[in-house]
Design a protein with these regions (language model features):
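Phosphate/oxyanion-binding active-site loops and adjacent basic polyanion-contact surfaces
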Residues: 1-6
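Acidic/histidine-rich catalytic cores and adjacent linkers
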Residues: 7-17, 21-39, 43, 53, ...
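Inter-helix linker motif
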Residues: 42-67
């Protein structure tokens, strides 16, 4: 259903707008449509970016699951640091090579290693509280589990799509606003639903304009 809706909407917009980039969550079928070599829209030159917030949320879930496993609770101590480092890596890097160089550094950071042979952590000097934070011993079960998550090939195969540092949060906020006019508990004919969606769009535009004034 999402694939059909995406195709219908995207085809319509392509005829009305000069689309340079589209941002979605990690939907397999949509990713297939936007594949630069095999996808339906491969010849359109549209950049496909993935929502950074959903990626960070997914990373948080996997870290939490690993941290609740026996012998790996130290992952929970550094969970926030690892997720923040992912945000930083995506914002700082311009390509896959730069991202991996920065991203892999977190495996040393959580061990308390901030000065390395080929470089150092990019953060400012740590305050006393942070410097005294519990670290993960290299080679421990927790560190091995963290390494498997950080270096997971399946998760990193689309890393370039995160480097544009995009988010769909405003769209999701608008979707919630639509529910005020067209709640899911009620049924509407297509013309009525379209009219209610347009009202939601007008309302959102007015609110946004007032906030900017």
């Amino acid at each position: 259903m999402e694939k059909h809706a995406f195709i219908k909407t995207f085809d319509r917009l392509m005829g009305e707008l000069n689309i340079k980039e589209i941002v979605t969550d990690a939907h397999v079928q949509i990713a297939s449509l936007m594949h630069p070599e095999k996808g339906r829209y491969k010849d359109q030159g549209v950049v496909h970016s993935l929502d950074i917030w959903h990626a960070a949320k997914n990373l948080t879930k996997r870290l939490h699951a690993a941290g609740t496993t026996s012998g790996q609770s130290q992952i929970l101590v550094c969970l926030k640091d690892v997720v923040n480092h992912f945000w930083f890596s995506c914002q700082k890097a311009c390509n896959r090579e730069e991202f991996m160089c920065i991203w892999r550094g977190v495996l040393h950071h959580v061990c308390g290693e901030h000065e390395l042979f080929l470089g150092r952590c990019l953060h400012a000097p740590l305050d006393e509280e942070t410097a005294n934070k519990e670290v993960i011993p290299p080679g421990s079960a927790a560190h091995e589990a963290l390494s498997q998550i950080v270096l997971n090939r399946r998760w990193l195969k689309d890393v370039e799509k995160f480097l544009t540092f995009r988010s769909t949060s405003e769209l999701e906020s608008f979707q919630n606003h639509i529910l005020m006019y067209a709640g899911k508990r009620f049924s509407f004919s297509p013309p009525v639903y379209e009219a209610r969606t347009l009202l939601a769009a007008l309302d959102t535009t007015i609110i946004t304009t007032e906030q900017c004034m």
